[in-house]
Regions:
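Glycine-rich phosphate/diphosphate-binding loop of Rossmann-like nucleotide-binding domains
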Residues: 1-52
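Adenosine-phosphate binding glycine-rich loop
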Residues: 72-186
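Rossmann-fold NAD(P) dinucleotide-binding segment
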Residues: 43-53, 63-80
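Short, well-ordered coil/turn residues at beta-beta hairpins
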Residues: 57-59, 84
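Flexible, active-site-adjacent loop/turn segments at secondary-structure boundaries
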Residues: 5-7, 12-20, 31, 63, ...
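Beta-loop-alpha module in the N-terminal Rossmann-like domain of NAD(P)-dependent dehydrogenases
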Residues: 60-68, 88-91
Length: 186
């Protein structure tokens, strides 16, 4: 768990309930996490990408994961990086991760849930419907699965199997072309 001031490493996994208590109820600093989980460690600064992990989830700001960070992730055996923000990984870091066999899910696909949920909300409102949380969640899961399938399929069809950046770009472009064609623009 990473914030601008520092980060927490919990070998037993992040305790989401404790984190919510600290940040949402107490409005305290991340340093308080240690009081809830004695085996956890708090570190000042940016070193979060130096921890041995299987999966890294850069979800904060643009360009937060740099080439040096990507090298540390690869050296520590990271197998996948999934962006949860708008371009949190620099181009150099993305290329390095891909060149070293790390599965890389770009934010334009992996982070599409927020935009998709907004579209669902607009649809619901325009039709004067009231969906339950479960209904919205099911619709969102379906959208995200379709995005993933389209990304993987596009990468494979164009000879870039496993390159999800290319797959997401092509799949997105195809959607725009289909919409423009349907509107008679092309």
């Amino acid at each position: 768990m990473y914030k601008r001031q520092g980060w927490v490493y919990d070998p037993e996994g992040i305790d989401v309930a404790a984190l919510k208590e600290i940040k949402e109820v107490k409005r305290a600093r991340l340093t308080e996490y240690k009081n809830y989980r004695p085996n956890s460690e708090y570190h000042e600064g940016r070193g979060v990408w130096n921890v041995k992990v299987d999966i890294a989830l850069p979800c904060a700001t643009q360009n937060e994961l740099h080439l040096e960070d990507a090298k540390a992730l690869v050296a520590n055996g990271c197998i996948a990086v999934c962006e949860g923000a708008n371009m949190p990984t620099t181009l150099e870091a993305t290329e390095y991760l891909q060149e070293n066999g790390v599965i890389f899910a770009p934010g334009k696909a992996a982070n599409a849930g927020g935009v998709a949920t907004s579209a669902l909300e607009m649809s619901q409102n325009s039709e004067r419907l009231s969906w339950t949380f479960e209904e919205v969640d099911a619709k969102l899961k379906n959208i995200m699965v379709n995005i993933c399938h389209n990304m993987v399929d596009a990468a494979e069809r164009y000879g870039f199997k496993g390159n999800y950046v290319v797959g997401a770009n092509i799949a997105g472009f195809e959607k725009v072309v289909d919409a423009m064609t349907a509107q008679g623009i092309v």
